From Swiss-Prot, chains A, B:
Cellular compartments per GO CC: cytosol
UniProt cofactor(s): [4Fe-4S] cluster
Residues that bind [4Fe-4S] cluster: 563, 566, 571
Composition bias, Polar residues: 1-13
EC number: 4.1.99.17
Cofactor: how bound: Binds 1 [4Fe-4S] cluster per subunit. The cluster is coordinated with 3 cysteines and an exchangeable S-adenosyl-L-methionine.
Species, as recorded: Bradyrhizobium sp. (strain ORS 278)
Gene3D superfamilies: 6.10.250.620, Radical SAM ThiC family, central domain
InterPro entries assigned: ThiC, ThiC-associated_dom, ThiC/Bza_core_dom, ThiC/BzaA/B
Protein name in UniProt: Phosphomethylpyrimidine synthase
Binding positions (Zn(2+)): 419, 483
Length: 633, 633
C-alpha cells in the first residue's frame, strides 16, 4: 500500500494502491459495452491449481494504479453522461453557499473550500428521474446494468452450482436468484424491494444496490464532531473505509465546516454518501432544537441535494404522540435525530414538521433521486428497551411513510435498531418486512448485550450477522469506540472488517450462489499450506500476514507445512495430507472406502508396513525450526 | 492492577490485584457454613442510586489482596478436606516421573520442577467417588452446594422477577430454574445434564458447573507448542485468562517440559484444567503416531489423573470405519487428536485403541473423578465440510460412548465444531442433545465463515453466541491468532472477552434470570453519564476507559454529559434527560402520558415557553471543550 503524500499539506492525504496480490479488473456488461464495472482479482500463487478469485470491490479508483488520484480535483465524473443522455434534467444555478452552512465558522478556522464547482442538475416536471420511476416504466438504466454485473462477482452463469448453493441455504423467504440480470434488478427496484442510492449530482459514483435479494451491504459512519477531528481526517477515513469494504459511507459531521467537509467527501467518493440533514439544520440555528423550522430544514435538504448526497436519514416517524412512550425506558431516546425532534415536538407541542411536510420532502428528493433512509429515532438504546411500543409504533409509521414516498416516485429504505438481545432480533426483521412492504432494512448492529464497552463491534457484529441472515439488506457498522468516543482510522478499519464478516456470514447462510467460493478458495489454500494465498484471500491480508510473521517470520515459513500454533508434529492438516497421499499411492479403491473386512486384509497389511516405513521422515524437526527462528529474531 | 515481580526470575510472574473498582466478596451457603464462594462486587460511584453489582468471579485468589500469592508454593489446597471427609479414597505412592514425561528434555533445557510434591489420592473399589455417583445416590456434595451458590450471582430468591425474565427469553427447551438450589444441581448431575469437572487431586479448585441449565461457560486454550513459548508464559497466560473470565483452561502443550508445565499450571489454577492426553502420549513415542500403544496412552492417563487434570479430551469416536468419509473433504481432518488417531488406525488397519479400550479408560478416570470431554476428532475444518457424514457418524458414536461412561459412573461432556455456517448451527445442537442424552455440549466457536484469518475470534464469536443460545453449555474460545500462530497474552485476553460476550448474549437470549441485571446497570450508568461506572460494569474496564481517555482525558470529563462521539450539542441521552427533567418539573401526569388533545393545551404552552427559556443554557460549549483538550494534550 502506498500512502500518498500530497505536496499541498493542507489537502487530505489518502491511501492508494492495490491490496496485497490484487489487481483491479473491469467487467464489461454485454448490454452496455461503454460501462466498466470494477472487480478486484486476488492473484493466487503459482502453487495453486485453481484460477484467481474475483471479489466485490468498493475501493474505487484509489486501488487502480493506472488512475492518477488528485483529491483536490476529485474523482472523474463519469456518471454525469448517463444522467444527461436519458434527459429530463436541467442544469441550473444552485443555491449560494452561506456562512451558516459552515456553522458561521470564522476565517481563522475555516477549512479550505473544494476548488472545482459543478452546477447542479435537477429533474424537470413531468419527466422520470428516479431509478424507481424508470424501473416502474420498464426501463433498464445504466445503473441497473452496472449493479447487475457487479453483483455476479465476475462469475458466468453456472445454474446448477448456483441452485445447489441456494437449496443448501436458508433465506427465510428471500428470492435470491441463481444469477443477477439487469431485468431482475429493474423488477426488484420497481417492487420497492431494492434501491440504488444515486443522486444525479453525485457523478463520481460507482452504483451499488441495496436489497435483501442481493449481497448484504455494510455502511461505515464517519464525520467529525464538535469536539474533535478535521476535514483531512474525514476524507482519509472515507477512502480508508471503502478500501476495506464499506459499501456506503455516512457523513455524520456536526459542528463547523460541515458543508465544506461534505463537499470534499462527495467529490472524492465512489460510494453512495448518506447524511442526516437535521444535524446541519441544527447548526444553522446554533444548536437549539427548539429554534428549528421547516424552512431551515428545507433549505438544508436542497443544499445537500445539490451537492450530491445519495440518501438522507429522515426521522419523520418520531411523532408527538409517541414521545411519551419513551418515558419509562432505561435509556430514553438514543437517536440524535430522534431526540432533537422529540425536543422540538414537546417544546412546541406540535406534530413533527418532518411528518407534516413529508409530501414536500418527497417532492424535493425525487428531483435529485435522493433515496430515503427513514430514520428510527425511537430505536432502543439498551437491551431493556428492545422491541418496546415506542419502537414499533414508529416502525408502523415508517411503513405508512414508505407508501407515500413510493407514490411520489422516491426510493426508500428503513433504518432499524440498535440494541436487541438475540431472541428478539427476528421479530424486528419480520415486522419490518410486513409493515414496510419489503423495503430494504438497514440496521445499526444490533448490539446483543450492553456489558462490553470497547468491544461493541463484536456485541453488534453478532446481531448484524443474524439480522443479515434474516433479511436485512445493509448493516451499519459499529466500531470499538461506540459509546466512548469518535472512531479513528484504526477503529474504522476494525468496524468495516467486522461488518464484512457479518455480511458475508449472512450471505453464506442465505445460500448466496457466489458467497462460498471465497471460503472454499481460502480453505483449500489453508489445507495446501499456501500461506500467502491464505492471507491474500482473507478480508485483511496485512493483519493475517503480520500475525503469522510474529512467530514464523522467514520467507521459507510461507511454504512450511505447519504453523506455530501446533508446530510441525501436531499439524492435523499435515497428518491428513500424509494419510491421503499415502492412500493415493496404493491406488486401491479399498483404501479409500475402507471397512473392517477380511477381504482386503492383504492390502491393509501392505499399507500398514508402508506407513511404518514412512515413520519419522514425514515430519520436520520442530526444534530445528525453533532454533532457526531464534537465529533470525 | 499490580504486576507481581517475582524475586526469583526463573519463576512465573503473574498479574494480581482486583479489577478496577472491584472487591472480592465471599458468599457463605446456608447448608455449608464452612464454604466461602467467591464473587466479585463492582463498586459503583456515589452518584449511583442503586446497590453495587455482584458478578461471577473466575479469577481465584489472585484478585484477593488479602491472599499472598506464591506461585512457587501453589494455591491453598482447601478442597482436599472435602474429598477426605467423605471417604472412599486412599493416598498412595504415585507413578514416578520419567524422562519421557517431559519429552526426554536435556538438563540444559529442562524447566524448573514444581517444588512441592503431593501424594495422589485415588478412589477405593466399592466406594462412590465421582460427583455423578454421589448425585445418583441422592447425596449433595460440597461441590454441588458451592456451585449452586456461585450460579446465583449473589442474588436472593426473587421469584417473580426471575420468572418474568425466563418467560421473556427463548431457551429452546432448556430448564433453567428461577433460582439454583443444591438439590437442583444434584438432580442435573444425576441426569447427566451437567458436570462438575473436579479431579480429587486438584485440591486448589474452586468448583464450577457445566450444563445448559446453568450460566454459559467459556474455556481458554493455552499451552506451548514445539515451536514457541515457555512454562513461565503459560502460567502467566492461565492467570491472565481467568482474570478476564475463563471458566476452565485447557493446557494443550506439546513438545518438551510437558509434564512440568502442567504441574505448574495445576498447582496454581483455581479453575478446572483440561488436557488432551494423546498429545503427551505422542511425545512419549517421539511424535510418531504409528508407534502409539494402549500401554503408553494408559500410562499417560494415570500420570495426568495423579496430577489432578479435571477433564480429558478423548477422541474415542474416530473409528477406523469413518476415516474414509473424510477423503473428499476440502480440509480433511483438522483435529490434532483426530488426525493422530486416523493415522494410527490406517497404519495398523485396526480399530482405534481409544474405542476398544473405552471400558478401561472409564475405570481409570472414575477413580479420580476426571470428566470425559469426548473429542470431535472428525469435526469440520471449513464451511464446505460442515455437518457432513463423517462429523455426524462420529457424533453418533460419541452418544454410544456417553452411555457407557455414565454406566461406569463417569461425568461426560461432548465436544463439537468448529466451522459451521449460521444456518447449520442449530442442527448440530439438536442432534447432539438427541444422540448424547442431553450431556453438556462444548463447542469450538463455531466459525461462521473462513474468509477472515486474523479475526477468527469474531467469525467464531458469532457462532458461539448462537450455539450458546441454542443450548451449548461451554464455548471454547478462538483467538485472533487462530490458524496463524500461537496466541500471546493479548490474544488470550481478546479471545476471553469475545467469548464472555458470546456466553452472556446467550444467557440473555435464554432468559437467564440474572443475566440482564448487568446490562441494565450498565445502561443506567450510561444514561446517567456515570462514565466511571459504565467502564467498571463492562467486561474490560481498562480498555473502555482508555478509549474514552483518547479524546476526553480529563477527570472532569468523567462526569461530562456527553462524549467525543457526538459532542455536547448532539448527545441524544443529554437531550432526552433534558426532556425528562423538564417534564418532571411540570409535575403534571399529562406531560408524561401526553397526547394531542385540547384539554392540556395550557400546560403545553407553558411547557413550550419554558423550553425556549432554557434554550442555549442546557448545552456546554463544544469549542471550549475542544480547546481544553488541546491544552491538556
Amino acid at each position: 500500500m502506498n500512502i500518498r503524500s500530497n505536496p499541498d499539506t493542507t489537502l487530505p492525504a489518502v491511501t492508494t494502491g492495490p491490496l496485497p496480490s490484487s489487481r483491479k479488473i473491469y467487467a464489461v456488461p454485454d448490454s452496455a459495452p461503454d460501462l466498466r464495472v470494477p472487480l478486484r482479482e486476488i492473484i493466487l500463487s503459482e502453487a495453486a491449481s485453481e484460477p484467481n478469485l474475483p471479489v466485490y470491490d468498493t475501493s474505487g479508483p484509489y486501488t487502480d494504479p493506472s488512475v492518477t488520484i488528485d483529491v483536490n480535483a476529485g474523482l472523474p465524473r463519469n456518471r454525469i453522461a448517463w444522467v444527461l443522455e436519458r434527459g429530463g434534467v436541467e442544469e441550473y444555478v444552485g443555491r449560494d453557499i452561506k456562512p451558516e452552512d459552515n456553522g458561521n465558522v470564522g476565517a481563522d478556522k475555516a477549512a479550505k473550500a473544494f476548488t472545482a464547482h459543478h452546477k447542479p442538475l435537477r429533474g424537470l416536471d413531468g419527466h422520470k428521474i428516479t431509478q424507481l420511476e424508470f424501473a416502474r416504466a420498464g426501463i433498464v438504466t445504466k445503473e441497473m446494468i452496472y449493479v447487475a454485473e457487479r453483483e455476479n462477482l465476475g462469475r458466468k452463469v453456472q445454474l446448477e452450482r448456483a441452485e445447489a448453493a441456494l437449496a443448501d441455504g436458508e433465506s427465510f423467504g428471500a428470492s435470491v436468484p441463481a444469477f443477477i440480470t439487469p431485468e431482475f434488478v429493474r423488477d426488484e427496484i420497481a417492487r420497492g424491494r431494492a434501491i440504488i442510492p444515486c443522486n444525479i449530482n453525485h457523478a463520481e459514483l460507482e452504483p451499488m444496490i441495496i436489497g435483501r435479494n442481493f449481497l448484504t451491504k455494510i455502511n461505515a459512519n464517519i464525520g467529525n464532531s464538535a469536539v474533535t477531528s478535521s476535514v483531512e481526517e474525514e476524507v482519509d477515513k472515507m477512502v480508508w473505509a471503502i478500501r476495506w469494504g464499506a459499501d456506503t459511507v455516512m457523513d455524520l459531521s456536526t459542528g463547523r465546516n460541515i458543508h465544506t467537509t461534505r463537499e470534499w467527501i462527495l467529490r472524492n467518493s465512489p460510494v453512495p454518501i448518506g447524511t442526516v440533514p437535521i444535524y446541519q439544520a441544527l447548526e444553522k440555528c446554533n444548536g437549539d432544537p427548539v429554534a428549528l423550522t421547516w424552512e431551515l430544514y428545507k433549505d438544508t435538504l436542497i443544499e445537500q441535494c445539490e451537492q450530491g448526497v445519495d440518501y438522507f436519514t429522515i426521522h419523520a416517524g418520531v411523532r408527538l404522540q409517541y414521545i411519551h412512550l419513551t418515558a419509562s425506558r432505561v435509556t430514553g431516546i438514543v437517536s440524535r435525530g430522534g431526540s432533537i425532534m422529540a425536543k422540538w415536538c414537546l417544546a412546541h407541542h406540535k406534530e413533527s414538521f418532518l411528518y407534516t411536510h413529508f409530501d414536500e420532502i418527497c417532492d424535493i428528493m425525487r428531483k435529485y433521486d435522493v433515496s430515503f433512509s427513514l430514520g428510527d429515532g425511537l430505536r432502543p438504546g439498551s437491551i431493556a428497551d428492545a422491541n418496546d411500543r415506542a419502537q414499533f409504533a414508529e416502525l408502523e409509521t415508517l411503513g405508512e411513510l414508505t407508501k407515500i414516498a413510493w407514490d411520489k416516485g422516491c426510493q426508500v429504505m428503513i433504518e432499524g435498531p440498535g440494541h436487541v438481545p438475540m431472541h428478539k432480533i427476528k421479530i424486528n426483521m419480520d415486522k419490518q418486512l410486513k409493515e414496510c412492504g419489503e423495503a430494504p432494512f438497514y440496521t445499526l448492529g444490533p448490539l446483543t448485550t450492553d456489558i462490553a464497552p470497547g468491544y461493541d463491534h463484536i456485541t453488534s457484529g453478532i446481531g448484524a450477522a443474524m439480522i443479515g441472515w434474516f433479511g436485512c439488506a445493509m448493516l451499519c457498522y459499529v466500531t470499538p469506540k461506540e459509546h466512548l468516543g469518535l472512531p479513528d482510522r484504526n477503529d474504522v478499519k476494525t468496524g468495516v472488517i467486522t461488518y464484512k464478516i457479518a455480511a458475508h456470514a449472512a450471505d453464506l447462510a442465505k445460500g448466496h450462489p457466489a458467497a462460498q467460493l471465497r471460503d472454499d478458495a481460502l480453505s483449500r489454500a489453508r489445507f495446501e499450506f499456501r500461506w500467502t494465498d491464505q492471507f491474500n484471500l482473507g478480508l485483511d491480508p496485512d493483519t493475517a500476514k503480520s500475525f503469522h510473521d510474529e512467530t514464523l517470520p522467514k520467507e521459507a515459513h510461507k511454504v512450511a507445512h505447519f504453523c506455530s500454533m501446533c508446530g510441525p508434529k501436531f499439524c492435523s492438516m499435515k497428518i491428513t495430507q500424509d494419510v491421503r497421499d499415502y492412500a493415493a499411492t496404493l491406488n486401491d479403491p479399498a483404501t479409500v472406502g475402507m471397512t473392517i473386512s477380511g477381504t482386503i486384509e492383504d492390502g491393509m497389511a501392505q499399507m500398514s508396513a508402508k506407513f511404518k516405513e514412512m515413520g519419522g521422515s514425514v515430519y520436520l524437526d520442530a526444534e530445528k525450526v525453533k532454533e532457526s527462528n531464534k537465529a533470525l529474531s
